[in-house]
Amino acid sequence: MGEISITKLLVVAALVVLLFGTRKLRTLGGDLGTAIKGFKKAMNDEDAGAKKEAGGDIQAEKLSHKE
């Protein structure tokens, strides 16, 4: 009874299409894709900034340890 079959998934998909319509689902998918791209870009920018800061710290340590 708790198993999810292909027919149950098709019924749920049909209900979603009937409730929201195909146009709304297309715009929702596009908005979701844009949000994911923005999130990934922000994460990459943050990682690049952290690497630059870490690289600067390493250079500062090398210079300070030179005698």
Swiss-Prot record:
Molecular functions per Gene Ontology: protein transmembrane transporter activity
| UniProt keyword terms in alphabetical order | Cell inner membrane, Cell membrane, Membrane, Protein transport, Translocation, Transmembrane, Transmembrane helix, Transport
Please give an example of a GO cellular component term from this record: TAT protein transport complex
Q: What is its main location?
A: membrane
Annotated region Disordered: where?
Answer: 46-67
Transmembrane intervals: 4-21
Sorted alphabetically, which InterPro entries does this protein's record hold? TatA/B/E, TatA/E, TatE
Q: Where in the cell?
A: Cell inner membrane
Task: Name the membrane topology term.
Answer: Single-pass membrane protein
**A single GO BP annotation from the record?**
protein transport by the Tat complex
Q: Which family is this protein grouped under?
A: Belongs to the TatA/E family. TatE subfamily.
Q: What does this protein do?
A: Part of the twin-arginine translocation (Tat) system that transports large folded proteins containing a characteristic twin-arginine motif in their signal peptide across membranes. TatE shares overlapping functions with TatA.
The protein here is known as: Probable Sec-independent protein translocase protein TatE
From the UniProt record, report the name of the gene that encodes this protein.
Answer: tatE
